[in-house]
């Protein structure tokens, strides 16, 4: 009923029957009230809440066409970020932060692009970290080496859709669902 970026893990809504999905799809904004993600980012994210209003769009001049960029003529995007805690893992980066992101709008690569543009790229993000160097290597038929994975900090990007708030027509109150079944690299880091 909704989507996640290709390399993003976490909660996703499915309907058992096509007819149910079609009916709910029309009213998704009234059913799926809030979506929250956890991201491990490079850098010391500021305390408190950070609101990011940054329009995004693809750049036809970018050799990686699918990457989103901050452009004044882009689609309006709004993400609310909040520091959960700073992390200590010098083998990945001198400073890391666990950040909660709430999508207010839902655009392609919104969280990844916003964090990268703000100077806090997501650990393991092949597309937005180091100007897409690792994404390009894979796109050209190459494979990532152990050294590449070490530089990225993880085998997978550390972005996880961990919580949704839903309101179905037959419920009196909205309900919240959470998952903490993180990918192995992320689970190991968060357990430390």
Predicted features along the sequence, with ranges:
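RNA pseudouridine synthases
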Residues: 1-192
């Amino acid at each position: 009923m909704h989507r996640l970026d290709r390399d993003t893990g976490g909660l996703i809504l499915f309907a058992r029957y096509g007819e149910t999905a079609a009916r709910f799809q029309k009213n998704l904004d009234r059913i799926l009230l809030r979506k929250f993600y956890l991201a491990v980012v490079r850098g010391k994210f500021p305390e408190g809440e950070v609101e990011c209003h940054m329009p995004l769009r693809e750049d036809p001049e970018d050799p990686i066409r699918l990457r989103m960029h901050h452009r004044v003529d882009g689609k309006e995007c709004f993400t609310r970020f909040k520091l959960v805690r700073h992390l200590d893992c010098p083998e990945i980066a001198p400073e890391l932060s666990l950040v909660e992101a709430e999508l207010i709008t839902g655009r392609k690569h919104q969280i990844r692009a916003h964090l990268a543009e703000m100077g806090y790229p997501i650990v393991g993000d092949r597309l937005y970290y180091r100007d897409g160097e690792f994404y390009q290597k894979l796109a050209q038929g190459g494979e990532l080496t152990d050294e590449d994975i070490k530089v990225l900090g993880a085998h997978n990007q550390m972005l996880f859709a961990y919580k949704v708030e839903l309101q179905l027509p037959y419920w009196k109150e909205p309900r919240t669902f959470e998952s903490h079944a993180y990918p192995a690299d992320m689970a190991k880091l968060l357990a430390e």
